[in-house]
């Protein structure tokens, strides 16, 4: 990438969204305006306990989707009922920051989420009390980087968007202005202001 390239969503946040959030919440200091810190994409592969090759598919999918090599997560404790031993690989995780984070969010919101069949919006009740938002996707095929013909099996993933918001209301306002398609109480998608 060239040095003067700025991701589209990052530029939109800096030029438009920050001013609207400052006006909406009457912040005295620009450092109080909520922003996105990082995005964590986690793919749990419980079957990897029985077949260690399963984790390779998850690593390949996450690498293609995020453009970054994932960290393999291992079991911390042995659980006999799940035939799980300590140190076995059970998932993969990627933490995105900076321009890669903005590019991933842009692709997620403009390309991936609209490709989900019968998509009616994301629930706005999945905030953690500190303005961070977590949601799950049931399979990885909505990302255009994944070739459906070469995919070995569908895998779900959890995506956590970590913000600097102090409460859920600020986090919800930030993500709605970034373009997250939240459902309202009637189950219809809300429009961004």
Swiss-Prot record:
A GO biological process of this protein is: translation
Q: Name one GO molecular function term.
A: rRNA binding
- One Pfam family from the UniProt entry? Ribosomal_L5_C
Q: Name one GO cellular component term.
A: ribonucleoprotein complex
Q: Which InterPro entries match?
A: Ribosomal_uL5, Ribosomal_uL5_bac-type, Ribosomal_uL5_C, Ribosomal_uL5_dom_sf, Ribosomal_uL5_N
Transmembrane segments annotated in the record for this chain? none
Per UniProt, the keywords (alphabetical) are: Ribonucleoprotein, Ribosomal protein, RNA-binding, rRNA-binding, tRNA-binding
Gene3D superfamilies annotated for this entry? 3.30.1440.10
Q: How does it assemble?
A: Part of the 50S ribosomal subunit; part of the 5S rRNA/L5/L18/L25 subcomplex. Contacts the 5S rRNA and the P site tRNA. Forms a bridge to the 30S subunit in the 70S ribosome.
**UniProt family annotation:** Belongs to the universal ribosomal protein uL5 family.
Please explain the role this protein plays, according to its UniProt record. Answer: This is one of the proteins that bind and probably mediate the attachment of the 5S RNA into the large ribosomal subunit, where it forms part of the central protuberance. In the 70S ribosome it contacts protein S13 of the 30S subunit (bridge B1b), connecting the 2 subunits; this bridge is implicated in subunit movement. Contacts the P site tRNA; the 5S rRNA and some of its associated proteins might help stabilize positioning of ribosome-bound tRNAs.
Read off the PANTHER family from this record. 60S RIBOSOMAL PROTEIN L11-RELATED
By what name is this protein known?
Large ribosomal subunit protein uL5
Q: Which organism is it from?
A: Corynebacterium urealyticum (strain ATCC 43042 / DSM 7109)
* Gene name, Swiss-Prot/TrEMBL: rplE
């Amino acid at each position: 990438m060239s040095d003067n390239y700025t991701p589209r969503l990052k530029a939109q946040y800096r030029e438009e969204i920050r001013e609207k959030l400052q006006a909406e919440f009457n912040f005295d200091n620009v450092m109080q305006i909520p922003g996105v810190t990082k995005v964590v994409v986690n793919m749990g592969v419980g079957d990897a306990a029985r077949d260690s090759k399963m984790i390779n598919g998850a690593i390949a999918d996450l690498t293609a989707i995020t453009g970054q090599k994932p960290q393999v997560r291992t079991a911390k404790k042995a659980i006999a009922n799940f035939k799980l031993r300590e140190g076995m690989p059970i998932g993969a995780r990627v933490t995105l920051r900076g321009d890669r984070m903005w590019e991933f969010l842009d692709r997620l919101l403009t390309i991936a989420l609209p490709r989900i069949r019968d998509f009616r919006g994301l629930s706005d009740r999945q905030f953690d009390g500190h303005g961070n938002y977590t949601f799950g996707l049931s399979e990885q095929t909505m990302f255009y980087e994944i070739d459906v013909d070469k995919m070995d099996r569908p895998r779900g993933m959890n995506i956590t968007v970590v913000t600097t918001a102090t409460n859920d209301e600020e986090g919800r306002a930030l993500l709605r202005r970034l373009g997250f398609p939240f459902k309202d109480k009637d189950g219809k998608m809300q429009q961004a202001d």
